[in-house]
UniProtKB/Swiss-Prot annotation:
Involved in the biosynthesis of furanonaphthoquinone I (FNQ I). Catalyzes C- and O-prenylations of different phenolic substrates. With 1,3-dihydroxynaphthalene and 4-hydroxybenzoate as substrates, catalyzes O-prenylations. This is Flaviolin linalyltransferase. The keyword Chaperone does not apply. Keywords: Prenyltransferase, Transferase. It comes from Streptomyces virginiae (Streptomyces cinnamonensis). Belongs to the aromatic prenyltransferase family. Its EC number is 2.5.1.123. It is an enzyme of class 2 (transferase). Does not require magnesium or any other divalent metal ions for activity.
Length: 300
């Protein structure tokens, strides 16, 4: 679907239909208020749908869309009652980042069951942030500064492309642009072993070698890295060496949107050794979006 054609009812119908392909019921009372709150940006937004293969995401279907840098998505979410303050440092993080860093644009993520979940903060294309600079922000998770040396050893500490703020799980993702060397099998194994994560399977190592980006998950209760995940852009996810599972494969074959647009596949290993994948397909795509610059810049 081309940009400029999104409308509230049309987007909602597409979300509901796509979730139904996975036998997930769309909770209108959760989804409609989010779309309505950002109705003005939907016609020009990148709009994506995401499914995951792990048990934690069973019964959920995630959607996300981009928001221009001139709009503060957290302020909108608060104003429209999509989220509420509880006194956690995560609630000031987006505002603190705005004060310390140049911001290009944002993304908003929600589940059709769980409602509002995340905000992404994209830094300007070609102007990566560093962990050292981000670590000066008082509301950042303590693990950011604690793991700076680890990521510096692998050439990632000054390659931060964006961050993801997860209000539902009280975690933060840091997304790095990765060179081919960083996602090679020896380096991936070394990173996992250094922080005590299980070795990926041979299948996953092959997948990782195609990645343009790496991201890590941090929280405010620990200085440890929760996980490391790898991002691959592909035209045909079924050709990847990834265990997408029958439901996700059926979704790929059945979803009527984004047939000719790129797909994103993410892979991760949990601390318990579970390997899982997330597939992201696009209802509405824009080649000039900051999102596409991330793909291009990740391997430049």
């Amino acid at each position: 679907m081309m940009s400029g054609t999104a409308d509230l009812a049309g987007v909602y119908a597409a979300v509901e239909e796509s979730a139904g392909l996975l036998d997930v019921s769309c909770a209108r009372e959760k989804v409609w208020p989010i779309l309505a709150a950002f109705e003005d940006v939907l016609p020009t937004a990148v709009i994506a749908f995401r499914v995951a293969t792990n048990a934690r995401h069973e019964g959920e279907f995630d959607c996300r869309f981009t928001v221009p840098g001139s709009i503060d998505p957290y302020a909108v979410a608060l104003d429209k009652g999509l989220t509420h303050r509880s006194g956690h440092p995560i609630e000031t993080l987006v505002a603190d980042v705005q004060k310390h860093c140049a911001v290009d644009s944002y993304g908003v993520d929600f589940g059709v069951v769980g409602g509002f979940k995340k905000i992404w903060v994209y830094f300007p294309g070609g102007r990566h942030e560093s962990l050292a600079h981000l670590g000066e922000i008082p509301s950042m998770p303590p693990g950011l500064a604690a793991t700076e040396g680890f990521f510096a050893r692998y050439g990632l500490a000054d390659k931060v492309d964006l961050i993801g703020v997860d209000y539902a799980s009280k975690t933060m993702n840091v997304y790095f642009a990765a060179s081919p060397e960083v996602v090679s099998a020896p380096t991936v194994l070394a990173m996992h072993r250094e922080i005590g994560l299980p070795d990926p399977s041979e299948q996953m190592l092959d997948f990782c070698s195609r990645a343009f980006g790496v991201y890590t998950t941090l929280n405010w209760d620990s200085s440890k890295v929760e996980r490391i995940a790898y991002s691959v852009k592909t035209e045909d996810p079924l050709e990847l060496s990834a265990r997408l599972g029958s439901k996700v494969e059926q979704f790929l074959k059945s979803v009527p949107y984004g047939i000719d647009t790129p797909k994103m596949v993410y892979a991760a290993v949990t601390a318990g050794g579970e390997e899982y994948y997330k597939l992201q397909s696009y209802y509405q795509w824009r080649t000039d979006s900051r999102l596409n610059l991330s793909y291009i810049g990740g391997r430049s």
